[in-house]
Regions:
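Adenine-nucleotide phosphate-binding core of ATP-dependent small-molecule kinases
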Residues: 1-33
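Active-site proximal loops enriched in glycine and acidic residues that flank catalytic Cys/His/Asp
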Residues: 2-5, 16, 41-46, 95, ...
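Short, glycine-/Ser/Thr-/acidic-enriched flexible segments
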Residues: 8, 47-48, 98, 108
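Flexible, glycine/charged-enriched surface loops at secondary-structure junctions
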Residues: 30-38, 68-73
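Glycine-rich phosphate-binding loops at beta-strand->alpha-helix junctions
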Residues: 38-60
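A glycine-rich helix N-cap at a beta->alpha junction
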Residues: 62-66
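Glycine-rich phosphate-binding/hydrolytic loop that grips phosphoryl groups
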Residues: 73-110
Length: 110
């Protein structure tokens, strides 16, 4: 999608915008249901690796007092806080190991 957006593909840009808005809307629903949050965590494939997606999603959450540290947001492959120290909600990236989780669950069943 990024390559298509760079080539000026409007459908790709719309798909990207809908994805980011949908994630922010989903987060907002949980924020409302829980009457606020202390932290938001990005994980798994997109959450860990799609730096622009994280930035765009967080941009929708400004009403929560969330501010993004753009340098920290550029880090990949490690557990890191990507919000600024003065952000009212901590935002982090936590890498996952889905294969290990599946293995542990399987061992527990066997």
């Amino acid at each position: 999608i990024r390559a298509a957006i760079a080539d000026g593909n409007e459908d790709a840009k719309n798909a990207y915008d809908v994805l980011c808005y949908g994630i922010a809307k989903f987060v907002g629903g949980y924020v409302a249901a829980m009457n606020g949050v202390d932290a938001i965590v990005f994980t798994a494939g997109i959450g860990e690796n799609a730096i622009p997606v994280r930035e765009k999603v967080v941009s929708y959450l400004g009403y929560l007092g969330v501010t993004l540290d753009k340098e920290a947001n550029g880090v990949r492959g490690e557990e890191i806080v990507i919000s600024t120290p003065d952000s009212k909600v901590k935002v982090a990236v936590i890498p996952t190991n889905e294969e290990l989780a599946i293995c542990r669950e399987t061992v527990a069943l066997v």
